[in-house]
UniProtKB/Swiss-Prot annotation:
Gene3D superfamilies: Ribosomal protein L14 (2.40.150.20). Keywords: Ribonucleoprotein, Ribosomal protein, RNA-binding, rRNA-binding. One of its GO terms (cellular component) is cytosolic large ribosomal subunit. Binds to 23S rRNA. Forms part of two intersubunit bridges in the 70S ribosome. InterPro entries: Ribosomal_uL14, Ribosomal_uL14_arc, Ribosomal_uL14_sf. One of its GO terms (biological process) is translation. Belongs to the universal ribosomal protein uL14 family. Disulfide bonds: none annotated. This is Large ribosomal subunit protein uL14. GO terms for molecular function: large ribosomal subunit rRNA binding; structural constituent of ribosome. Part of the 50S ribosomal subunit. Forms a cluster with proteins L3 and L24e, part of which may contact the 16S rRNA in 2 intersubunit bridges. SUPFAM superfamilies: Ribosomal protein L14.
Amino acid sequence: MKPISASIVRALPVGAYLNVADNSGAKVVKLIAVKGYKGRKRRLAKAGIADLVIVSVRDGKPDMIGQIFKAVVVRMKKEWRRRDGTRIKFEDNAVALLKDDYGTPKGTIIKTPIAKEVAERWPDLAKIARIIV
């Protein structure tokens, strides 16, 4: 995975409910695992912006509810600092669903804004995003 140019805070623990930013059919998902997280015994794994996570669909199309998908965190409420000194935060926590580990998006468009750090690490998501902040 490509490194990103920001000091990211991991603020989304396992069990967090997240909105879905794309048009894949899911509306709300639950975070169940963070890929590549190296933590301590008995400590919940946490995710930050542009992290690859595993989610379970909780609300959306009836045929998708309960299914497990890989996703990327594209927005986070907790503010983080960029290398130029600016701080950025969004009004909700959101993910974009993926078809595979390589970053192929399940949806065809992301109408809401995504972070620049996501576009750096996941170029296929940047292609379908309308707004990159």
